[in-house]
């Protein structure tokens, strides 16, 4: 592990400016042993570390920069059901059972986030209510088709808003011909959520280290038995050797 990476300790974002109690984690001062090493401190890596620690595993998570310096701490915070493509598109790309699995995973993601926020009491400004808006009639027809498709698959949280004047009264502009309201999608403050995951993972026993870049992975018989890579394969100027499966 390399502790000499150029870092972005000052996150310099509106999300960071809203937070006074940012968690801080050290860089390691000696060699470390663990059962599972997680590389990358974004949503995916931190959730993996939390879940593994909650299930009794000895976990270390290392982050080359500081927690929240990448996309997980800087994104739009949208908490939305489904995928960017509809189920018909997914079904054309995959066998039926795999397409259904992918679809179900996307639809359950919001519920998993909600459960995690409640269980760990994460204050991340989670709010529900989301509008998919249509600028013209063709887009509105696509949204109505989405409404019908999701309803057939058992998702009953969508409401079509196809009265332009009524919609304008809610959102303050008449630029849209209509919208689809999703009562089970919403928004979070992503950096607060990530910090909440980090605190929960640490409380569960995961060891978290910042400013700790991984430059190489070697398979040895007496170190971490598993390594989970949840970051870019080539952070900055580092070289990275993947562990053989």
Tell what function each PLM region has.
Residues 154-157, 164-180, 184-186:
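Hydrophobic, small-residue-rich alpha-helical packing segments that form membrane-like cores
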Residues 230-235:
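Conserved small/polar residues in nucleotide/adenosyl-binding loops
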């Amino acid at each position: 592990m390399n502790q000499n990476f150029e870092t972005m300790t000052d996150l310099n974002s509106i999300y960071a400016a809203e937070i006074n109690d940012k968690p801080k984690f050290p860089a390691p001062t000696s060699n470390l042993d663990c059962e599972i090493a997680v590389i990358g401190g974004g949503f995916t890596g931190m959730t993996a570390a939390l879940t593994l620690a909650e299930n009794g595993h000895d976990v270390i998570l290392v982050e080359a920069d500081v927690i929240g310096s990448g996309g997980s701490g800087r994104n739009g915070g949208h908490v939305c059901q489904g995928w960017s493509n509809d189920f018909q598109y997914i079904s054309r790309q995959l066998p039926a059972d795999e397409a259904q699995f992918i679809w179900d995973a996307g639809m359950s993601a919001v519920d998993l986030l909600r459960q995690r926020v409640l269980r760990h009491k994460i204050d991340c400004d989670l709010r529900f209510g989301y509008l998919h808006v249509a600028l013209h009639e063709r887009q509105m027809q696509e949204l109505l088709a989405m409404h019908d498709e999701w309803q057939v698959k058992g998702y009953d949280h969508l409401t079509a808003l196809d009265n332009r004047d009524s919609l304008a009264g809610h959102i303050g502009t008449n630029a849209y011909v209509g919208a689809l309201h999703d009562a089970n999608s919403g928004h979070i403050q992503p950096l607060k959520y990530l910090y909440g995951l980090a605190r929960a993972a640490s409380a569960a026993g995961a060891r978290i280290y910042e400013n700790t870049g991984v430059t190489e992975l070697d398979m040895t018989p007496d170190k971490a038995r598993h390594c989970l890579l949840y970051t870019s394969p080539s952070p900055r100027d580092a070289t990275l050797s993947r562990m053989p499966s």
